[in-house]
Amino acid sequence: MTRALYVAVLAFSALALGAPSASAQGAIAGTVTDDQGPLPGASVLILGTSRGAATLADGTYRVADLRAGDYTVRVSYVGYGTTEYTGITVRDGATTTLDAELAPQSLGGDEGITVVGDAPLIDVEQAASAYTISQDEIAARPVRDVEDVIANQAGVVRDPTGLYIRGGRATETGYVVDGVSAKDPLAGTGFGLDVGSNALREVEVVTTGADALAGDATSGVVQVKTREGSDTFEAALAYQTDNLGGLADGGSSFMEDNVEFNVGGPILRDKLRFFVSGQGTFSDEFTRFVSTPDQVRSSLYDAEWLAPRLSNRWAGLGKLTFVPRQGTKLVGSFQRSLAINQNTRMLQVTGNDAVVRPGYQYAFALQPDAANTYTQDANLSYLKLTQVLNDRSFVDVQLSRLFTRLRSDANGRDWRPDNVDSELDPESLVDFPVTIFGDPREGIPADTALFVLPGPGLFNNGGIATRWHDHFAEEVTLRGEYTRYTPDESYTLTAGFDARLNDYQWIDIVRPWVGAPIVLPDGTTTQSNRLGQSSDIWRVKPRRTAFFATNQFRYRGLIANVGARLETWAAGAYVDDLVEQEAFTIPEALRQGYLDDTTPFLGLRWKARLLPKLNVSFPVRENQVLFFSYGHSMRLPHPTYVYANLDPFYQDRSFFSDLGNPNLNPEIDIAYELGLRNQLTKDDALNVTAFWRDKFDFITVASVTVADPTGRETNRALRVNGDFARVRGIELSYLKRVSDWLRGQVSASYSRASGLSSTNNDALQDLLQNGNVDNTFETPLAWDRPLDVKASTTFLYDRPAPFLGVPGLNRFRLFVETTYRSGQRYTPVEFIDNERNPFTGERDWRPIYETVDDPALRFSESGRAWWWFDLRAERRFGIAGTDLVASLEVSNLFDQNNAVIVNPVTGRGYPDVDPATTDFVALRGDADYDVPSNLRDPRYEDPQTSGLPPFNPARYLAPRHVVLGLKYSF
């Protein structure tokens, strides 16, 4: 596919859908008033057209020459709130009367546009792909957090490894909560602060290039707005469980419980309001049928009640809103989340073949109490002032602090023991009773050497997880934003800045017991300055600033947003001092390059980049808008690639260890988008979008020679800007509404994401194996999912009379959604031969499959497609003016198997069998059970068997999950 093809598709769609038809013209006319009388000079716009008018001295207006159809009319006036009237029908040769009354604008409540009538299905003026999920829509879906909320939007792919927007990496997503970046900059997950679904007011996901107001995102931006209190007291308490009574013994129970509450209302009516919410979700996950630790422990917190299950999430929010006078609003908020679990995807910085693997630690299935436990604690606090300056301008000033910390330990153990008195490396050993390996055809002669079968392939020797990790990130941000618009709103200027002070600390140690004291027989202890097998320790204080401006022009239906964002950043005094001191850890060429490419200012050395932004929308015909967007975005490299092992004191002396590159440049994304929005009727909408993204200056690995403290030359892995990727695709979506009781949508996308490598470490493997990098082939990326189709429908019947006359079938809501998606990418294998039979010497033993040598075939195949259905049903009961809601949620309704870990021999997941009851010898010769050489094949057990068994329960998505719930609100 090429960009020209996408343009041709959109042009054809515009011609086909926009062909004019001969008909009479209609008009809309009326009067605009306030509580005092007519409003002269008010603006009346017919959205999705180039038509509009200004009211005359008596407040009247008339908009003529409108084609028959349904329209949305926006009425606005300086100093008054904007109101949109939807579903205004115009008929041939007739004039539709629409009178409007505006109220003075106040920032005391939620800013926004008042909608009279059914909300528009789409925003025909929007010049970029963005989807907004309202609080009511969130309540209708089976969701727990922000990722759940946006997972079913077009262009968004979520799986157990992360969330990907339009082919970008999971780490490229921007995550903003109430105007503050809320992702952990060191964890590499794309998210950080966890916000409970009951605290969400609105979630918007922007899948195209973000506008100038957002930064540090090269894939998409998730914008979260949390709830505020109102002048009406309200409270709610909810409980959901999948283990009620006999449900706990079924396969659809993950031993999950979810408790949440929220309360809000006035403290001083019309002046001071509050809102408080909390959520706790605890689950043993579907892997509980294989293994569950007796107790998940964290070395950060001793309280075991914080982690009653395998996966534990806590989230809380408190917010105060103060409106001392009209035009002034002050909001203060504190949010905190805590997660304790054993999911390795909590820390996604390094890794090569694990890029698309789920986080379940299958190797520790026999001793889960020795696996890695991850604890992430995040809190966000801010104070935001909104001040109206006059009837045409206002400012926002926000001071915020985000603090995130993540600890990974061996299920709560100290970073290393005071005394090494046992084997700590986890291994799979032969267990008792042993199994003798012999010829099954005849008895074993007495003088024959006996062999036993090896261990199970899973760790069983009491060894513990080999990585100990701790990091924290503090980010203090001051942000200011100024907005000014003309009286007729034909021009709007938004300009501002944000300044960030960061403080990062990173400690990562592999096999930390290496170098720990060992008590000798004479009572003395060994002495060592070794800090684990390998380690990386640093603390840095980088700085960032940004200046941004967006100019919006409106002219006869055309809306153009032209803007730019200037990003500046400094690596911090830590790097500047090492460069100035000519530290031996920084090669001379790298040091000189850093000095040449940075500019000294305010005691630090800075870099800068200008990012232009443009998006335009204009009506092709009534209710049909063509839009185009173009923008540059950037994301700074992960700090480990900048600072690793630069400190001469904390030097990792392991073979080919990482070396930070302080002169790394940011990764760049250039996004293009062309789309067509069609409001076919007030209840039907169709969108067609083509997009293209060029990504370059991605991080890869090169070999560099540096001198160690003794002067000996050593090879190090240096991160450099040398990789690229690109994404291209087409999206279609159709939305349908039937009165107030049915709403549905269908979206489909076809895209391709390709590049030189899928992780920052792909080139490292070539360097270690071959001494050079053979990475010149552009191949599909590991997370590429070409086809993604989603459909959902919401049926709402909130009437006293029963539906179809069935008693009790009233005041209910039903939500059903389905997803069909291309399967997981994998690199094919080829059949080499069969192993020799240990009894006969013939080559009729285990089939040998090896990964193909051709690098052009990397991730060239896709596994079997994924398909599943989710359902949520609820019934409301009125109790003395309050509401009690009973709910049923079923995920993966039809219990379909969708392979996350693909067997490259078959292109499917390893068959879902019970290893304890299956006769694997009888399955010899069955190609469905063939596996590559790096996995254990249970059909051919012999003394040389090695590798993990193929029974990892996380090889499939979660099976059917049934959750019951009750919610009481008043």
Describe each PLM feature range.
Residues 803-849, 864-868, 874-970:
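C-terminal beta-signal and adjacent terminal beta-strands/loops
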Residues 20-123, 139, 157, 181-184:
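Periplasm-facing N-terminal accessory domains of Gram-negative outer-membrane beta-barrel systems
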Residues 253-345, 373-395, 565, 612:
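Transmembrane beta-barrel wall of Gram-negative outer-membrane proteins
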Residues 112, 396, 400, 619, ...:
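Membrane-embedded beta-barrel scaffold of Gram-negative outer-membrane proteins
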Residues 212-214, 229-234, 268-272, 327, ...:
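Short loop/turn motifs that connect adjacent beta-strands in outer-membrane beta-barrel proteins
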Residues 81-82, 87-101, 109-212, 216-221, ...:
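Periplasmic N-terminal accessory/gating domains of Gram-negative outer-membrane beta-barrel systems
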Residues 238, 569, 687, 691-694, ...:
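Gram-negative outer-membrane beta-barrel transporters
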